């Protein structure tokens, strides 16, 4: 049985990049995902990205080499929540 890896990302417009807010493997990842869903936080399955970002520390900024894929992921989540591109700066 394959172990689940979960990595929670957060974007703060005052920081230069998104950062790792939480992470876990196995049972901890399952709990992290359940907690996110319970609180209405979008959950997206991107196994390769989660595996790559898992090696960052909680609080660590996403490296520049991942900017594009993470930006695409965050834009997808933002759009699926019914927001337009112009809404990003106005939310707080």
Regions found by a protein language model. Give the residues of each.
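Divalent-cation
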Residues: 1-92
